[in-house]
């Protein structure tokens, strides 16, 4: 149990309840890392805080689910002795443990969830590690059971308020879960080291993030060929060390701490040639944690105009282009060789760093939790 520490404002009325977080572990994927900064900003609003950290995508056994559920029930029981209880879940496509803990959560507590991959909460609810290790088994289970899975999600989330990290994501969630209250929030821009101005960095672009399907790494050869030879390409992120070598591309693998600072200072822009559409399962609408990471380092972003990137481009710091590698390469070269354009985007990013700080982004969640706790107390 972490002790709440007020690190945001000097004085504020706290919400009279315990907050319990259910999320994947730190370093198990982007959602677990996101939860660490997010919950640190939320803790000071509560007098008591507990957390249950689970295995990440593909790293949860069936027995783990029973253990986590028993742990959550025990934490809720202890917290209820001290007053109201709010349980917040971080849900994503392949993080099955938080979903199954939510499905078994007591209806007598207030539940909320950040849904990272709208329009569904968990796309593959049976993807425990034994299933994740066998692609044929994964699809053999989930494809035939899509309709049942959809109904299971609607039942599990029926008493839960859902948050999406974009407006387009919130609209899609409302269509999928018409019985749920859905609220729109934003992905925060974390605080990172100040780097040199973008135009003073090497003439290079970066691809960053977990090397998962749909994240653009499969377009690396095509992208390298489309960019002028004087533009270097640098790739970093968990799992990228397993990518096949490509001439003219530096592949770094995972970078943490000072290594991450060095990576971002070695590129003038981050590219997001994302395509999160599956012909079998449909289109995902995640907010880009990689874009927020790039903004933290004052780095412009260019990507395909798909999913949530078109909406994000309206806020600045990001340019969305048609879903063409050739078009992305042309626009990227124009931007990274134009000092005035880079300075304009840097200025926009500076505003985003202030407007989408974690302290501000957490406020819609805090407002809902306060309202829900007050309503429960009033109805007693």
Predicted regions and their residues:
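Membrane-proximal helix-turn-helix segments that form the acceptor-binding/catalytic region
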Residues: 102-105, 127-162
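Nucleotide-activated donor-binding/catalytic signature segment of Leloir-type glycosyltransferases, i.e.
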Residues: 240-264, 268-269
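Nucleotide-sugar-dependent
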Residues: 272-292, 296, 303-311
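Conserved acidic donor-binding segment of nucleotide-sugar-dependent glycosyltransferases
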Residues: 315-326, 333-340
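Short N-terminal targeting/anchoring amphipathic segment
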Residues: 76-97, 109-114
């Amino acid at each position: 149990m972490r002790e709440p520490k007020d690190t945001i404002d000097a004085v504020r009325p706290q919400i009279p309840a315990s907050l319990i977080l259910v999320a994947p572990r730190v370093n198990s994927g982007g959602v677990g890392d996101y939860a660490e900064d997010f919950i640190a900003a939320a803790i000071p609003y509560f007098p008591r805080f507990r957390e249950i950290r689970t295995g990440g995508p593909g790293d949860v056994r069936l027995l783990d689910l029973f253990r986590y559920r028993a742990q959550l029930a025990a934490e809720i029981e202890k917290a209820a002795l001290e007053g109201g209880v709010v349980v917040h879940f971080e849900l994503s496509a392949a993080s099955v443990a938080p979903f199954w803990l939510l499905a078994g959560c007591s209806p007598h507590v207030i539940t909320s969830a950040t849904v990272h991959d709208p329009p569904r909460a968990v796309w593959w609810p049976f993807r425990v590690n034994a299933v994740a290790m066998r692609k044929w088994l994964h699809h053999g289970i989930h494809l035939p059971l899509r309709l049942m899975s959809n109904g299971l999600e609607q039942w599990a989330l029926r008493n839960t308020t859902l948050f999406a990290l974009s407006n387009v994501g919130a609209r899609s969630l409302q269509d999928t879960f018409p019985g749920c209250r859905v609220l729109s929030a934003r992905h925060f821009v974390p605080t990172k080291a100040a780097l040199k101005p973008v135009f003073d960095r090497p003439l290079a672009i970066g691809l960053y993030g977990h090397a998962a399907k749909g994240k653009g790494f499969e377009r690396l050869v095509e992208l390298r060929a489309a960019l002028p030879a004087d533009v270097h390409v640098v790739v970093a992120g968990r799992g990228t060390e397993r990518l096949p070598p490509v001439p003219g591309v530096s592949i770094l693998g995972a970078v943490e701490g000072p290594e991450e600072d060095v990576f971002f200072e070695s590129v003038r822009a981050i590219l997001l040639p994302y395509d999160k559409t599956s012909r079998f399962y449909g289109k995902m609408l995640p907010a880009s944690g990689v874009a927020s990471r790039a903004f933290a380092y004052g780095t412009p972003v260019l990507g395909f105009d798909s999913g949530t990137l078109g909406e994000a481009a309206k806020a600045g710091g990001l340019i969305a282009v048609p879903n063409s590698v050739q078009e992305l390469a042309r626009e990227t070269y124009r931007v990274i060789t134009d000092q005035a354009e880079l300075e304009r985007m840097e200025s926009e990013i500076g505003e985003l760093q202030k407007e989408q700080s974690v302290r501000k982004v957490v406020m819609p969640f805090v407002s809902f939790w306060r309202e829900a706790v007050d309503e429960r107390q009033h109805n007693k």
